[in-house]
């Protein structure tokens, strides 16, 4: 049975991916930071681990909680947004929240899970955003969010060189009807999760082709 680790899977795209993977017979290990999130994962018959990705002390214990595991896929799904532009200075609290959740959490998770993934020739993926693409930036809105996703993309690009036995991939999930995306978004979590899973299967089948890639949810390449 294949095993997937979903980091930050208590709601939205992460929870839907957990549901779909379990439905297809995968073993799913999901993380959440609170009791409600853990309960939602367990209700889907997933193994649930308590990890607060924004807390380095909590995040540093991920490898210990996963001791002895072999993973086929690990996906960092956690993310938060701030919609302010650059006309006002960001607060330290907002800056730290975005950078800790969107960047540091993934940066701490990757080296902890890499040995578990390498044994299976696995994939480490992050849910990034096209808003982190320098080439496609057309406005200054959500500036800190954009910066955090650009930093996450660079971390993944660097990680591919440092972990050549892995396939490290960054994904744009689309504009999705989640708490972050809003009800007006064109994609449902079901559609986005299904697309991401289908694309991940192509990535697993052709790892060398996709190492260090930045992809749309449908598998099309995105400019950095």
Annotate each predicted stretch with a short phrase.
Residues 80, 84-99, 107-108, 120-161:
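Catalytic loop of short-chain dehydrogenase/reductase
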Residues 24-39:
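Conserved glycine-rich Rossmann-like NAD(P)H-binding loop of the short-chain dehydrogenase/reductase
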Residues 10, 14-20:
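N-terminal Rossmann NAD(P)H-binding glycine-rich loop of SDR-like oxidoreductase domains
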Residues 170-173, 182-224:
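C-terminal helical subdomain
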Residues 4-8:
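Conserved N-terminal Rossmann-fold NAD(P)-binding element of oxidoreductases
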Residues 53-69:
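Conserved Rossmann-fold cofactor-binding substructure of NAD(P)-dependent oxidoreductases
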Residues 43-57:
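Rossmann-fold cofactor-recognition segment
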